[in-house]
């Protein structure tokens, strides 16, 4: 019994030590953009949508959240991670947080992309002066459906469902943080 306990303790200590050396910046990155593999998969999915071509060509930059998880029963929340691009290169990582109240039920996972029309809009995001108010909304992209939207206050937001079902699909109340890569 004691020998099993010691073996388990030793194994646990070794696994903690090996995971402590993990560096997320060393994960597989695209050599052209510097983006993570997860971000590149999401970027490819958004670039495959013809209606977004003009946004990719004309935007000064964009924040791409490869996975946003959202759920709630009355009180809800969302959290996501992504990266910020400008001139085809990754500037740094971004995170998204949201807390919401009201009638909502369920859970979902989705991707989100925020296009910044001008440099000042990208700068506003990377300097930490950016959040969506309670009335903000995004365009949900569905296969085979026409996408018609324009910039509002220098940004255009699109989401792509990954899975789940949730009554309530606003982006209101989202707050963001940005951390530049060195």
Predicted regions and their residues:
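Bacterial N-terminal signal peptides
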Residues: 7-15
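Bacterial N-terminal signal peptides that target proteins for export
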Residues: 1-6
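Sec/Tat signal peptide C-region and signal peptidase I cleavage site
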Residues: 16-20
């Amino acid at each position: 019994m004691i020998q099993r306990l010691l073996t388990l303790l030793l194994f646990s200590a070794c696994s903690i030590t090996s995971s402590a050396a993990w560096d997320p910046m060393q994960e597989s990155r695209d050599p052209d953009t510097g983006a993570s593999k997860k971000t590149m998969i999401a970027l490819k999915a958004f670039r495959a949508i013809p209606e977004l071509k003009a946004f990719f060509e004309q935007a000064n930059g964009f924040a791409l959240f490869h996975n946003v998880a959202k759920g709630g029963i009355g009180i809800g929340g969302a959290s996501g991670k992504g990266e910020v691009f400008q001139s085809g290169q990754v500037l740094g990582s971004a995170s998204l947080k949201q807390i919401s109240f009201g009638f909502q039920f369920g859970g979902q996972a989705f991707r989100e992309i925020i296009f910044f029309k001008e440099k000042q809009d990208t700068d506003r995001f990377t300097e930490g002066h950016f959040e969506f108010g309670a009335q903000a909304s995004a365009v949900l992209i569905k296969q085979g459906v026409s996408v018609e939207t324009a910039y509002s206050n220098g940004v255009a937001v699109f989401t792509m469902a990954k899975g789940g079902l949730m009554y309530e699909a606003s982006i209101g109340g989202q707050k963001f943080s940005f951390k530049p890569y060195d």
